[in-house]
């Protein structure tokens, strides 16, 4: 539920509302690209804050200890307030609001992920941690359906921002008791007998490649995730089903997270990560090959299916490689993901500016995104050979 608020509303409500804002004349496509980048820049800033928090706190001993549940609560409240703020008729303030919403999203994501994965590790059920990543999918479905209904009712974007802000507070109230007083997330110690998988070296190079490959996923999906409703309108003008492609993406996210949580993984997660990238690349390819109702629907589903599964597997890899500093390195990986997201929208704006039509610009943007995802998948396959896994006993 917390991730549904922070990600489904705080980050992704902008996507289904973008056509409404364009229709109302309060924004144009180049401005929308930069507004999206402001949110992703905030996401990067929040992730970096999580990354360097242990370093800062170690050098400033007077700072109070970080309380994970309190950070989650603060992020949820900030998300609701900042979403409501987008209804204000102050376009000059919108980039700052979206930036701050990105910071809040990153804080909630990192601390919720660390808390849940730590709890599941203690219960010796790490795969069940993937259930939390159904939250963004549920949030995307709900926000997409709400936006579709508001379009049919001829509401304005300002009304939609108010609705989503109120919805964020309602959902936050439901999950509020879960994050009461509790311990700050800590990496779980291995316990019990048996065997675990470990690569032959846990050096900085391996972690660096993982973070870069994960960052590529941020770039690869963001073009479609930000502009899907606009791309669909350019390809299928007048269709009554245009507003359903985004909820279909969210449904794929939801289902993919459930599937990932039920997989009995006994092999290398990097192989699953490569497969996720290939699936997302295929989703983009379907839309390019068949820009039709069926093509966009199938493409949206394929793009969404591995979306949070990629995050789940990548965060598990981070915990495997750096168990003692999991939260910090989760922040680093999330920061790389944020950099990938930041690059996407300005690239779209650049390609649109140098294309004969919006459709041609979006096509070129999607081709670049697909190529990036394929490159990321190949990186994981290369890592499989560079750092093969071996079984080690744990006690």
Q: Regions from the language model: what does each represent?
A:
Residues 92-101, 294-302:
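Paired small-residue
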Residues 46-67, 256-268, 352:
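Helix-to-loop junctions at the C-terminal end of transmembrane segments
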Residues 99-135:
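Cytoplasmic helix-loop-helix junction between adjacent transmembrane helices
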Residues 268-314:
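C-terminal transmembrane helical hairpin of 12-TM major facilitator-type secondary transporters
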Residues 28, 67, 149-166, 349-373:
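A membrane-interface helix-boundary motif in multi-pass transporters
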Residues 324-357:
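A late C-terminal transmembrane helix in Major Facilitator Superfamily
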Residues 90-91, 123, 128-180:
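Helix-loop-helix hairpin linking two adjacent transmembrane segments in secondary transporters
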Residues 15, 206-247:
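Extracytoplasmic gate region of multi-pass secondary transporters
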């Amino acid at each position: 539920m917390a991730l549904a608020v922070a990600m489904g509303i705080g980050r992704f409500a902008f996507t289904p509302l973008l056509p409404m804002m364009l229709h109302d004349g309060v924004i144009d496509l180049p401005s929308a690209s930069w507004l999206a980048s402001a949110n992703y820049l905030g996401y990067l800033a929040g992730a970096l804050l999580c990354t360097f928090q242990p370093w800062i706190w170690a050098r400033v001993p007077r700072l109070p200890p970080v309380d994970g549940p309190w950070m989650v609560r603060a992020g949820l409240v900030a998300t609701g307030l900042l979403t409501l703020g987008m209804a204000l008729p102050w376009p000059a303030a919108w980039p700052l609001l979206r930036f701050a919403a990105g910071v809040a999203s990153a804080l909630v994501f990192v601390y919720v992920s660390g808390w849940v994965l730590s709890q599941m590790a203690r219960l010796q059920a790490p795969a069940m941690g993937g259930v939390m990543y159904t939250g963004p999918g549920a949030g995307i479905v709900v926000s997409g359906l709400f936006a579709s209904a508001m379009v049919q009712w001829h509401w304005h974007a300002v009304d939609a921002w108010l609705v989503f802000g109120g919805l964020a507070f309602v959902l936050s109230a439901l999950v509020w008791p879960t994050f009461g007083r509790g311990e700050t997330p800590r990496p779980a110690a291995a316990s019990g007998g048996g065997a675990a998988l470990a690569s032959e070296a846990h050096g900085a190079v391996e972690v660096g490649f993982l973070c870069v490959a994960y960052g590529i996923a941020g770039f690869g999906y963001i073009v479609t995730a930000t502009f899907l409703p606009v791309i669909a309108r350019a390809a299928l003008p007048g269709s009554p089903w245009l507003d359903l492609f985004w909820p279909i993406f969210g449904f794929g996210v939801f289902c993919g997270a459930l599937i990932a949580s039920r997989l009995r993984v006994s092999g290398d997660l990097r192989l699953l990560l490569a497969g996720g990238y290939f699936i997302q690349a295929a989703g983009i390819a379907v839309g390019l090959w068949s820009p039709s109702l069926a093509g966009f629907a199938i493409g949206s589903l394929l793009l969404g299916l591995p979306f949070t599964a990629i995050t789940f597997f990548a965060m598990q890899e981070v915990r495997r490689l750096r168990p003692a500093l999991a939260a910090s390195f989760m922040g680093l990986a999330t920061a790389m993901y944020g950099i990938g997201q930041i690059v996407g929208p300005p690239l779209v704006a650049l390609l649109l500016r140098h294309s004969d039509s919006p459709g041609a610009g979006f096509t070129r943007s999607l081709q670049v995104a697909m190529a990036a995802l394929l490159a990321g998948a190949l990186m994981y396959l290369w890592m499989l050979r560079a750092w093969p896994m071996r079984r080690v006993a744990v006690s």
